Curated annotation (Swiss-Prot):
SUPFAM superfamilies: FKBP-like, Triger factor/SurA peptide-binding domain-like
Species, as recorded: Legionella pneumophila (strain Lens)
Record GO terms (molecular function): peptide binding; peptidyl-prolyl cis-trans isomerase activity; unfolded protein binding
PpiC domain residues: 170-271, 281-380
Encoding gene per record: surA
Catalytic activity annotation: [protein]-peptidylproline (omega=180) = [protein]-peptidylproline (omega=0)
Disulfide bridge partners, by residue number: none
Name of the protein described by the UniProt record: Chaperone SurA
Length: 429
């Protein structure tokens, strides 16, 4: 239930378990002008152990885990440096909003949330700092590659056309993966060594060794410390080289080595989800009258006038005639305020919330939005099978996510290639 709460602190170093800090802390690695200390590493190792236990995964060897955790901290540090260089900041109000969403998703209020965090040995301030770090990294990734992620209508149509010929293309796939990394421009020898390493791991798995433990020990992937668990993905979200494999795999099967841009991959199919169901939406036929302050009408006059119009309609005046006479939404005023049939999410939240709560043919009291004051009337409602449009929108989002993940991986690889990284503690090299 509280996986998301724990995960935030498992992802980032912070000082979540900083008891007994020493005045002089040993440096274990140098990353450009920054250092990673032994206390930071120890704190992250302890958090990773807790996460491994919570997910019922086999605990890897201590020395191997420390090496993997350090590599993770290096990646995080590089991205935090980029956030600082780009002047990216997170306001306290944004952190508050993020925490409220996490609490709500776990069916907790903020007081209960604090209690759960405290039970994990983490102070509220430290938890907020880790949330800030997570948001910073997300934002710097968006700034670095997000603007280049474009999915065209042609790409969506082409995917749907191709997927239509693939059996089980509408299913979801729960995968784990192990990544054996490659440099940006690997030599033939480096390619051979990485492929042999991946093949050796595959042989270990075939002989019965635990996939998740090997992912924690050996993978360079983003989800290595979670046992390589990618979660449940739609086919369109997966790299094409993965998608071609998974549709032919059986649950429990491991495939690879698969060559991708950032290295050789082993993938395990954990489970297959059900086929997407029909998507039915409620459309609303709605009309409105808009009054807003302008050069000729101060706010108090706008409020006074919209209330006066409301009273007249309640007394029997025709809504359409009043809209034509008074509404400042020119496009709909000529049609008696008619906005036509609207889909969920097309109108601003305050308007839509009131609209959805109205019985048919009942006019709302004045509603304030960013555009001004509205009187709203629902003329009719109907159910519409929106499956095709919904599927296209889903595919667009999945393709965007696929491109984003691949772009972030390439960007992270480039960051490492351009950075000065010195692992001072040779036991961790």
């Amino acid at each position: 239930m509280f996986k998301r709460i724990a995960l935030v602190c498992a992802l980032f170093s912070g000082v979540c378990f900083a008891e007994g800090k020493q005045l002089l802390d040993k440096v274990v690695a140098i990353v450009n002008d920054n250092v990673i200390t032994s206390s930071e590493l120890n704190a992250q190792v302890e958090l990773s152990k807790k996460q491994i236990i919570a997910q019922n995964m086999q605990m890897p060897d201590e020395s191997v885990l420390r090496k993997q955790v350090l590599q993770h901290l290096i990646d995080v540090d590089l991205e935090m440096q980029m956030a600082k260089q780009n002047g990216i900041t997170i306001e306290n109000a944004e952190i508050d909003e993020a925490i409220e969403k996490i609490a709500a998703s776990n069916h907790l209020n903020l007081s209960q949330m604090r209690d759960e965090i405290t039970k994990q040995g983490i102070s509220w301030q430290e938890y907020r700092q880790n949330i800030r770090k997570e948001m910073l990294i997300s934002r710097v990734q968006q700034k670095a590659v997000g603007k280049d992620i474009i999915v065209t209508n042609e790409q969506v149509d082409q995917y749907l056309k191709t997927a239509g010929r693939i059996e089980n293309s509408n299913l979801t796939y729960h995968l784990k993966n192990i990544v054996i990394p490659l440099s940006e421009e690997p030599t033939t020898r480096q390619l051979q060594r990485a492929k042999i390493e991946a093949e050796n791991l595959l042989n270990k798995i075939k002989k019965g060794e635990d996939f998740s433990r090997l992912a924690i020990e050996e993978s360079s992937g983003e989800f290595a410390l979670e046992g390589g668990d990618l979660g449940e993905r739609h086919l369109a979200e997966l790299p094409e080289v993965f998608a071609k494999e998974v549709v032919h795999m059986k649950v429990g099967q491991v495939a690879g080595p698969i060559r991708a841009g950032n290295g050789f991959h082993l993938i395990k199919l954990v489970a297959v989800g059900g086929e997407n169901q029909r998507h039915v939406i409620t459309q609303t036929h709605v009309r409105h009258i808009l009054l807003k302050p302008d050069a000729s009408m101060v706010p108090s006059e706008a409020i006074k006038q919209v209330n006066n119009i409301y009273r007249q309609i309640q007394s029997g005046k025709d809504f359409a005639l009043m809209a034509k006479q008074y509404s400042l939404d020119a496009a709909s005023a000529v049609k008696g305020g008619d906005l036509g049939w609207v889909n969920p999410g097309e109108l601003v939240p305050e308007f839509e919330k009131t609209m959805n709560s109205l019985p048919l043919h009942k006019v709302s009291k004045p509603v304030k939005t960013q555009y001004g004051w509205h009187l709203i009337e629902v003329i009719a409602r109907r159910q519409k099978d929106d499956s095709e449009a919904f599927k296209k929108q889903q595919v667009r989002q999945f393709l965007q996510q696929r491109k984003f993940v691949e772009a972030v991986q390439n960007w992270q690889q480039h960051l490492r290639s351009q950075a000065y990284i010195n692992i001072v503690d040779k036991d961790l090299a």
